[in-house]
Amino acid sequence: VNAADSYVAIDLETTGIGAKRERITEIGMVKVENGAVTDTYHTLVNPGRPIPEHITELTGIDDDMVKDAPMIQDVIGEVIAFCGTLPVLGHQIMFDYGFLVQAAVNGKLRFERSGIDTLKLCRKFMPPEEKKNLAAACAYFHAAQDTAHRALSDAMAAHELYQAMKRLHLSGNEDAFAPKVLQYKAKKERQATQRQKQHLHDLLKYHKIELTVPIDSMSGNEISRVTDR
């Protein structure tokens, strides 16, 4: 089993945690072939809902920046095409992978890849007491680290972190650096019916509850999750 010399490093910024509930706000990808960066991809994404304040503080991405950006369904095809058949790489790659698989399924597309998780490698090769977030790991391994919490710079940082760890630890650990099959189960989200929207609207009014996202931006699945609570 060989370590990967070619892959696509990916980082997403999102409105929160959980691919079934939250939305993508930014995509950054770095294509690496035979160890060298050959291409990059970057876009902001309109999540179709307000970005929470604490997320804006973390990422610097606000509603104004994304209001004219494409929706995820407009770019998921080119994201998949950019990746080709290469494995994907990221710091906690299942987070990003889950969002992309969900977006693909919603667009009646398939996105199935093997992947490399730099966070798992950090857990293997760093002392337990060391912080293992992307910035801390890059500092520990003397890998270049640009502005944290923007998608393209974080994707580049994950790539450089992988290369730095590989230089130090590849010998005898080939299997740890090899891409593994990623599995994320996603179901296509149903379009919300007018009846569902009205039912939720009436429920919220009756219970005097305010939603943080517009009802019109919610899928049928999301409305069901709220009304079932």
What is each residue range found by the language model?
Residues 150-163:
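Acidic, divalent-metal-coordinating active-site segment for phosphoryl/phosphodiester hydrolysis
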Residues 162-229:
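Acidic two-metal-ion nuclease catalytic site recognized across multiple nuclease folds
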Residues 14-16, 120, 157:
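Short, glycine/acidic-enriched loop or turn micro-motifs at the edges of active sites
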Residues 113-125:
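A short, structured active-site edge motif that brings together acidic residues
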Residues 103-106, 124, 140, 164-168, ...:
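Active-site catalytic microenvironments for nucleophilic, acid-base chemistry
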Residues 1-113, 127-149:
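Conserved non-catalytic scaffold segment of RNase H-like nuclease domains
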